[in-house]
Amino acid sequence: FINPSIKDIKLSKMLDTDCVEIHTGKISNLIKSKKNYINELNRIKNSSVLANKYNIEVHAGHGLDYKTTKILNKIKEIQEFNIGHFIIGEAVFIGLSKVIKNFKKIIRN
């Protein structure tokens, strides 16, 4: 994980990294607590754009669920979402197949 910051993306470039996973815990907590998350969303967007410019593949993860993934999916530079914990937890209640179908709908839109 790296923080969604220009500094961390530049350091990743200096280290010749080909892929980063942006930590989305802060935005996930802000969204879940119904607080303003726009500044954090902009940090993630700006970091993702710069990483893409540097040809660094961008992944995102930590605290993701349906709502947070739908919001972050608007950032086209993010190529992968790591949502394992929520998927398994939700599958206990509605089944793995249904959870996967729900996420496919979110990501395809």
List the model feature ranges, each with a label.
Residues S5-L15, A60, L64-I78:
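Catalytic cores of alpha/beta
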Residues F1, E40, G61-H62, V92:
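Glycine- and other small-residue-rich loops at beta-strand/loop junctions that grip anionic moieties
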Residues I6, L41, Y66, F93-S97:
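Electropositive phosphate-/nucleotide-binding environments in soluble metabolic enzymes
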Residues N3-S5, G25-I27, I56-E57, G61-K67, ...:
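Active-site beta-loop-alpha junctions enriched in small/polar residues
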Residues I44-H62, K104-I107:
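N-proximal accessory regions
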Residues K32-Y37, G89-N109:
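C-terminal helical cap(s) of enzyme catalytic domains, especially alpha/beta-barrels
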Residues C19-I31, E77-L96:
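Glycine-rich phosphate-binding active-site loops on the catalytic face of alpha/beta enzymes
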